[in-house]
Regions:
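PIN/NYN-family metal-dependent endoribonuclease catalytic core
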Residues: 7-8, 18, 23-53
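Amphipathic coiled-coil/heptad-repeat helices and related helical stalk/stem segments
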Residues: 23-24, 90-94
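Acidic, PIN/NYN-like endoribonuclease modules and their adjacent C-terminal/linker elements
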Residues: 84, 88, 92, 101-105, ...
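Acidic catalytic patch
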Residues: 42-43, 63-86
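Extreme N-terminal starter segment of soluble prokaryotic enzymes
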Residues: 3-5
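Short secondary-structure boundary segments
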Residues: 10, 42, 109-111
Length: 144
């Protein structure tokens, strides 16, 4: 079974790298393990880079490069533009990319930024919901 490819909001990626013990951290671990892939476009990559470059994270250049090497072998897409109003227009690239993700799945800690009527069929999940969905896709261990 091929791993799903989902869009992860910047807040989920950052939280997962900084705190590997929560659900965002488990999702980042799944990306590293290859049991989850990222769907992203150049605008999302740019946002990831800009956020990580902020001094408040105190991350070394080597750590930053290790994080970004992870993103290079994911599912880079060029989604068609959507016409929908979101509370934060900067969130639109994530919703657009989600249209091309497995099950149109977008994982965010800010679901309120994506009102149901404006999601264009995308499934918005919290990190905990995403982890549960990912675990339900996995085959049971051999011998069980």
């Amino acid at each position: 079974m091929n791993p799903p490819s989902w869009v992860l909001d910047t807040n989920v990626i950052v939280s997962g790298v900084l705190n590997p013990h929560g659900y965002p951290g488990r999702l980042v671990d799944a990306i590293i393990a290859g049991t989850l892939r990222l769907t992203l476009d150049d605008r999302i990559l740019t946002e990831y880079r800009e956020v990580w470059a902020r001094s408040k994270f105190s991350i070394s250049r080597a750590q930053l490069e290790a994080i970004f090497s992870l993103f290079l072998n994911q599912d880079l897409v060029t989604p068609p533009p959507l016409t929908t109003d979101l509370p934060d227009p900067d969130d639109l690239p994530f919703l657009e990319a989600a249209q091309l993700a497995t099950d149109k799945t977008f994982v965010t800690g800010n679901a309120k930024h994506f009102p149901k009527a404006r999601r264009r069929g995308a499934t918005i999940l919290s990190p905990a919901q995403a982890w549960q969905k990912l675990c339900s896709r996995r085959p049971p261990p051999e011998g069980s």
